[in-house]
Regions:
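Alpha-helical segment proximal to the catalytic Tyr-Lys
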Residues: 135, 178-182
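C-terminal helical subdomain
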Residues: 182, 189, 208-234
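Substrate-binding pocket helix/loop in short-chain dehydrogenase/reductase
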Residues: 105-107, 111-116, 210-213
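Active-site loop immediately N-terminal to the catalytic Tyr-X3-Lys motif
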Residues: 108, 154-161, 182-183, 220
């Protein structure tokens, strides 16, 4: 059983899948894994559930979950974990992919609300999910896969809150790897560059920031959410 946050279905302008979370879910579904997927948008979650169950014959539980600065976040996350255990009885993998931000807004113009959006949806969500899943991952000798970003590694323009959240996730991941290794829990971080609906929107809304930040990988193409990002997680 895998819990994948931020796994709603999203389409690119050409109609292809544009969600890293859904790409990861697809890679796991092809291996026959049971899935618990979360997100803020119920329709995107429902669309993902219907597609995954129809195409791959797996069981998918979708749970609306929004970690933010005004919610009882431990209760939000504990509800997701409870539904996973009540339905499947175990958790083998936790994948923290969810992240919202006001990318493109320079640091001097960033508001507290925009900063909190990135920290709560990314860093705090990762923290709460890891804590809630820990006892179950200890039982299964499972794995945690967290998602960070080159935005923090390279100091991307207009991404101060996003970069701060992602660098916090990298630090949190390293500490968990140190502390949880004795429990047989494998903890890793991925910094992907895939062509997604969010990246497409970023390009259209902030063309200057996009040109400054997003460089073509040496392979000559952006990562495929399923075959190149999802397969790494599997």
């Amino acid at each position: 059983t895998a819990i994948i946050t931020g796994a709603g279905y999203a389409k690119l302008s050409n109609g292809r899948c544009g969600s890293i979370g859904y790409g990861i879910a697809t890679a796991y579904a092809k291996e026959g894994a049971n899935l618990v997927i979360t997100g803020r948008n119920v329709k995107k979650l429902t669309d993902a559930k219907e597609e995954l169950e129809r195409l791959y014959g797996v069981k998918v539980v979708c749970v609306q979950a929004d970690v933010n600065d005004s919610a009882d976040n431990e209760a939000v996350v504990n509800n997701v974990v409870k539904q996973a255990i009540d339905t499947f009885g175990r958790i083998d993998v936790l994948i923290n992919n969810a992240q919202a931000s006001a990318s493109g807004v320079p640091l001097a113009d960033h508001t507290t609300e925009q900063f909190n959006l990135a920290l709560y949806s990314g860093l705090y969500a990762t923290f709460y999910y890891m804590k809630a899943c820990y006892p179950y991952l200890k039982e299964t000798k499972g794995a945690v896969i967290n998602f960070a970003s080159g935005a923090g590694l390279f100091g991307n323009y207009g991404q101060c809150a996003y970069a701060a959240a992602k660098e916090g996730i990298r630090g949190l991941t390293r500490v968990a790897a140190t502390e949880w290794g004795k429990d047989g829990i494998n903890v890793n971080v991925v910094c992907p560059l895939a062509w997604t609906a969010k990246l497409e929107q970023f390009r259209d809304a902030y063309p200057d920031a996009f040109k400054a930040n997003v460089k073509m990988p040496p392979m000559g193409h952006y990562g495929n959410a399923e075959t190149e990002i999802g397969r790494v997680c599997v």
